[in-house]
Swiss-Prot record:
Belongs to the universal ribosomal protein uL22 family. One of its GO terms (cellular component) is cytosolic large ribosomal subunit. Part of the 50S ribosomal subunit. It comes from Mesoplasma florum (strain ATCC 33453 / NBRC 100688 / NCTC 11704 / L1) (Acholeplasma florum). This is Large ribosomal subunit protein uL22. GO terms for molecular function: rRNA binding; structural constituent of ribosome. This protein binds specifically to 23S rRNA; its binding is stimulated by other ribosomal proteins, e.g. L4, L17, and L20. It is important during the early stages of 50S assembly. It makes multiple contacts with different domains of the 23S rRNA in the assembled 50S subunit and ribosome. The globular domain of the protein is located near the polypeptide exit tunnel on the outside of the subunit, while an extended beta-hairpin is found that lines the wall of the exit tunnel in the center of the 70S ribosome. The gene is rplV. InterPro entries: Ribosomal_uL22, Ribosomal_uL22_bac/chlpt-type, Ribosomal_uL22_bac/org-type, Ribosomal_uL22_CS, Ribosomal_uL22_sf.
Amino acid sequence: MEAKAYLNMIRISPRKVRLVADTIRNKPVAAAIATLYNLDKRSAEPVLKLLNSAIANAVNNNGMDADKLFVKTIFVNEGPTLKRFRPRAHGRAYEILKRTSHVTIIVSDERI
């Protein structure tokens, strides 16, 4: 059985969030929590909260055992990009792209 959790519009670049997502993919949730807790990345905290939400969904909604769960799937998609302009010399302006991410995590109690 599976449980899902979503995190939308996180204001961190998808490329940076994917670094964290790759470290916890296919791990047991206890090992994934320990990894995220000790990881020195800005995106580790939101992904840790998302993982805890997925675990809570599995336990409360589906009645699964939290000790048997593992991270089956985690993927990061690109969200909408906020466009800002920075003034530059001689009346020019450069476009600054503020990228956002959508993160989806699926935990399961069935090993493949």
